[in-house]
Structure formats: C-alpha cells, structure tokens
Amino acid sequence: VRKRVQPLSFFILSLAISVVSIGVGGCQPPAEEASSAGKGAPAGAGDGAKRLQIAMIPKGTTHIFWRSVHFGALKAAEELGVDVQWRGPQKESDRDEQISLVQGFVNKQVDGICLAPLDADALVGPVKEAGRGGVPVVIFDSGLKAESDAFASYVATDNFRGGELAAKALADKLGGKGNVVMLRYNQGSESTHQREEGFLKGIAAYPEIKVLSGDQYAGTTTESSMDKAQQMLNRYGDEIDGIFAVCEPNAEGVLRALEDRQLAGKVAFVGFDSSEAMADALRAGKLSAIVLQDPVQMGYLAIKSIVQAIRGEQVEGFVDTGVYVATPENIDSDQIKKLLFPDKA
C-alpha cells in the first residue's frame, strides 16, 4: 500500500560500529554472500513466527559508502527481527551479474529485495519479474526507469539537489567566475546522472563560469578516474580553475591526479561522497567541499520500507535520506563528523 509522498524528517543514527562485523572489507571477495540476523523477534509476530528473509543487492561492496549502507541495514534488521542477505556484484559496472543476483534471490523465494540498480533500464525487467513472482522490491540509492507500481518504494538522496549544491560550493570557491570540468561516472547510473544534471543546471546560474568539459565518463574505479583526470589536465592545463567529481571513486581519482601534479589545493575541487582519504584532503584544504549523503540512514530506511511493504503497511513512494555539504569550516561539527566518519560516531 502506498500513499502520497510527504516530507520526511531526517535524523542521523548514532552508531557503534564495533558491535557489528560488516564483513565486506576490501580483502573479502565482494560477491561473497553475507547474512546478518537481528536479535529480536519480528515486530508484531507471534512465537515461532518465520523470520523474514530480505536480500539486499548494492551496486558494489568495496567502497566505504556501501559498507555504511550495510551497517544501517544491520541496524534495522536487529530492530525489526529480520534476516538480511547482503550480496553485490564484484564490479560496479557488471550489470549482468547484478541481474543474475536479483533472479537468484527471486528463485530462492526471499520475502523481499532491496536493490540499488547499476543500470536504470537494464534492471527494469528483473524487478518486474520479482513482482510477478510475489517478491516485493524496494529501490535504494539509484533510480529505476519503471512505473512507480513496479516497486514498493524508492529510498535515496535527492541527487539532483546534491548536484546543485555541488555547483554552488564550487562557484562560491571560485568567486562566481572561472573555467570548470565535470567528470561523469558511468552510463546507465541514474543516481550519478541526476547529480551531473543538477550540477550543470546549478552552474548555469553563474554566467562568468564556463564548463570546459561535462561529457566525459571517468568510469567506476579510482584508477580509471585518475587516468581521465590526467587527460583533462593534459588537455586544458592551466585553464582549469575548478573540478567536480560525482562519486567517491571518481573524487579519489581526481585527488590523486591533482596531488601527482602538485595542484591539490590550487585547483578548486568539489567531490561527492567521502572516504578517509577525502576527509583528510578536506581538512588539509586540498578539497573545497564534499557533498555528502547519509548511507547509514539509507540502508536503515531501505530495510524498514521493505518490511513495511511485506507486512502490508503504508510505504512512502519516495523516502529522501538527506544531502549535506562538508567544508573545511564545518568538518568538526557533530552532524558532519557522523557522515564523514560513520565508523567513529
């Protein structure tokens, strides 16, 4: 059952990550399945009731963003008394593997699926198949180009707004004038596409800022992003006054390229999503700003929404998990610290 979207009150979870072993660190094969169980009985269930089995399929598992999503999912699973099976593709560009994972969980007849689609078009069919098979789906992080009744809810950041905030942060750093480059992520990724479009709309409000390049895809890894950033620096050289990178691996790649050329801190630079290296760079003045999501909240609310859908409760059509901007000036505020360092909150 769905109801008209209402404004969502945001809150930041207080974490104690030492109590949970997330099990998706860089040394573990990303596609290896990880199961997590809540400790309590299912809410509203009688004695001996079957625990709900929820599959959660991210775009990948190695980046800190996904580990934070996983932690939030575990928090919700513990509170609701459900089991979460966490499994993602080895590469964030492997659509076929993600499709196979969805189909596999449908065949296993899990009670529900939370999915972050790698491709807004390619995952439509598998999601509809899940619905026909009686397995409800909640989409999280990145959108799906399907009718709204194809899935129970969409839990995500307002990525277009995030792109606009990135444009404002970069323009403020440049004093409203200069030449900028935007590096795109990967074709088919709806979340980053929205950030890119939001940025281009936002930066267009500054007539003295010129976009030198906004159509180049940096790819899904830090290495490919570093290579693309080097290409942009080779092509435009001293003309570049500012850069926007739309996700964690892209931003880390740009940071490495700037550091390699001793330009970090000299070229205005705004990233999206964080890591320890990015947070350190922000504090050191190598980054002008980082647009932040709340991945812990995203994981938490995705699990909460799918459980509501399974139990026939009202579910919001879109759940906005919030978007924030970290700067060197506010990096030590409680809210920003919890988003930058969820493992230390």
Where are these regions (language model features)?
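Bacterial N-terminal signal peptides
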Residues: 10-23
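A residue-level marker of the well-folded mature domains of exported/periplasmic proteins
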Residues: 26-345
